[in-house]
């Protein structure tokens, strides 16, 4: 790919990544304000135009009054209050459409111009397919709350968030491949140290760093999933204390019952797992960050410091979110913090993967 195409693709991927990050934030706001069920239809094309006239608003409000959420929860809501939650969900859906267009249309143009390598084509095709699936996944999630029970299925919510994170991950990975910010980064300190034994040690170190980093990325995905389950179950609104859950570190509900296949529906268990799994991952990240700092290689040292700082902030925002009964700002900061930590480790993965050994 020539330089102009590389620059254009880099800008496209950066814009797509930022839009997706914004989508995740707005999705969090939608969940925290309970606005997700305010639009009871899915019209990918006609739904782009919002209600404008009083008649339009009355039509939308009448549709909402027929929904289980209105009948069982929000039957006192006014049309002014309805407009507020409607616009939050509308913005989320509109942003989803814009993000989809921004990702899909340029991809088709690049294909038409035949400016993609074979590997790029397949990687970007995967991203495009995931974006389309995400649109259907969003409606599949919302649809779960339009039945008798007016609550969005928490497992579908977790799937929707995880799919967004996977797309974000793939966009970041593709961007790093194109711009190659750490290409030819040298792990070895100098040519004088390039004996065979030193080269072997460096290779072993590189393998260890890659493996450990991938483990942390996997654990982060798992923790994000548990966070989504906690959000979907409103499990952050119980046991608003730390470190204890009631009279002990382990809540009595867990001590008095066996774990079965309904564990993902259990508010207490999900909060317990999310808080202590988070502490475990935070400890691993701090240890890994210290390791990177001790290696004293400029890019790794900097990333290690960033990772350590982010995880300390993340633990703090998590505790604040819990203690203060899930305030929107703290909860959003906590959600974005998880994405930023994941991003940091995607950058670290790129660094350690692109080490060039001196011979």
UniProtKB/Swiss-Prot annotation:
Keywords: Cell membrane, Heme biosynthesis, Iron, Membrane, Metal-binding, Oxidoreductase, Transmembrane, Transmembrane helix. It is an enzyme of class 1 (oxidoreductase). InterPro entries: COX15/CtaA_fam, HemeA_Synthase_type2. The chain crosses the membrane at residues 8-28, 94-114, 124-144, 159-179, 215-235, 276-296, 303-323, 328-348. Its cofactor is heme b. It catalyses: Fe(II)-heme o + 2 A + H2O = Fe(II)-heme a + 2 AH2. Its main location: membrane. It is found in: Cell membrane. GO terms for molecular function: metal ion binding; oxidoreductase activity, acting on NAD(P)H, heme protein as acceptor. Interacts with CtaB. This is Heme A synthase.
